[in-house]
Design a protein with these regions (language model features):
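Short helices/loops that flank or line small-molecule/ion binding pockets
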Residues: 166-180, 184-185, 276-291
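Short beta-strand-to-loop elements that line the ligand-binding cleft
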Residues: 157-164, 245, 265-280
């Protein structure tokens, strides 16, 4: 078994530098990369330095030299290998790899927002026909895809800021955005939690909803726990460590609804009051890395990290808009794109998603949210209503 002789930790001096680039072709999001972590990921996945070099498009000699350089800089061995055995990262390298991946995943929405700002500046400089639509939304993996779709097909730039459902709706009321994304389960029984949280933020008549997508939320667990978990209470029953979502997010409301539905208290769920994350992907990474045993999220996030997915609830993802802004050109373009066949086809190919019942259509809130209390109409004056009929009957000598 072989380790490379490395420098002492006191010799290590490293700095972090972020750069961005313009490239020809389609937009590819805001994925950050680094040669060291690309190297470690390839070795972890393939178990061979030679195969890792092939997958990264470089020579064995170059990759080996790069590995030795990084070991000298970090003051720690990074790879363990011996003749005839799989190469694997050291414990230090694995800790480093997971820590970097977690930090990158946590920062992804903010980096995506920065990329979006830069892309908007370039688009506006190149073509002034591009419409800009400010969006604040609960995190959703389909929205990032929608952003690319409307940019390519509708000359529309979605300036998306991901945050909790409640904060997004507050931003809409404060006119920080034209559209706010939030999600609610297709369950009448969810009214106690969701209506309490959303009633102060959504006003029938003032707010309108636009159908965007349907998605399934469920438990994400590592495969060694898959046989134990069939329902939400199983997490508490088996004492699995749970990673929560931040307060104010729609998924946190869903978790609280599920706890209420199954008569669970915060103390029954290990980790409920501890570790929290802000996106589905960050929750999935926490589970995959072993920081937690279970979390709630969408199926696409679970599959991205090789986790088992236990479906729990189907949700509607809505885009809210003030009634007075429905005629805005950017909102009209968005509705048209959502109603088009391209968006429906995208959702059909995204695990755990499907098209909304009426994508792109402007919905009346009391119809879209069946648990929302309907506004009772004022009782009509019966005598006033009868007066015209009586007059008409008298004129024609009819009895009513």
């Amino acid at each position: 078994m072989r380790h490379t002789k490395v420098a002492t930790k006191s010799e290590t001096s490293l700095g972090l530098h972020l750069r961005y680039a313009f490239e020809a072709g389609e937009q590819h999001g805001a994925t950050l990369g680094n040669p060291l972590f690309d190297l470690l990921s390839a070795v972890l996945e393939l178990g061979s330095i030679r195969h890792a070099a092939q997958s990264l498009g470089c020579s064995y000699r170059y990759l080996w030299g790069s590995l030795r350089k990084w070991e000298q800089k970090l003051g720690e061995p990074l790879i363990i290998w011996s003749q005839g055995q799989r190469a694997r990262p050291t414990q230090f390298a694995e800790r480093l790899l997971w820590a970097e991946r977690r930090a990158r995943t946590r920062m992804q929405p903010h980096i995506e927002a920065l990329r979006s700002d830069l892309a908007r500046v370039v688009d506006e400089a190149r073509d002034q026909r591009h419409q800009l639509l400010a969006v604040q939304a609960s995190h959703d993996m389909a929205l990032s895809i929608l952003q690319k779709h409307v940019a390519a097909t509708a000359d529309l730039h979605l300036d998306i800021r991901f945050q909790g459902s409640q904060d997004a709706l507050r931003g809409l009321s404060d006119r920080q955005c034209l559209v706010a994304g939030f999600h609610v389960p297709v369950l009448r029984g969810a009214a106690p939690v969701f209506a309490k949280a959303l009633k102060p933020l959504l006003k029938p008549g003032r707010h309108k909803l636009i159908g965007c997508s349907r998605r399934t939320q469920g438990l994400m667990v590592r495969r060694e726990h898959a046989a134990l978990i069939r329902s939400f209470p199983d997490v508490a029953r088996h004492g699995l460590r749970f990673v929560n979502r931040q307060v104010g997010s729609g998924t946190r409301m869903l978790i609280d609804h599920l706890m209420h539905e199954h008569s669970l208290n915060p103390g029954d769920l290990p980790g409920y009051g501890g570790l929290t994350e802000e996106t589905h992907v960050a929750v999935a990474l926490c589970v995959a890395s072993g920081l937690a045993d279970a979390g709630v999220g969408v199926e696409a996030a679970a599959l991205e990290f090789g986790l088992q997915f236990v479906p729990l609830v189907e949700e509607n993802y809505f885009l809210a808009c003030l009634k007075g802004n429905l005629g805005h050109a950017a909102v009209q373009r968005l509705c048209a794109a959502l109603a088009g066949p391209g968006w429906c086809e995208i959702l059909k190919n995204l695990p755990g998603y499907r098209p909304a019942l009426e994508p792109g259509r402007v919905l009346v809130m009391t119809q879209a949210l069946p648990w929302w209390p309907k506004i009772k109409s004022k009782p009509k004056n019966r005598k006033a209503n009868l007066a015209p009929r009586i007059a008409a009957a008298e004129a024609t000598h009819l009895v009513i």
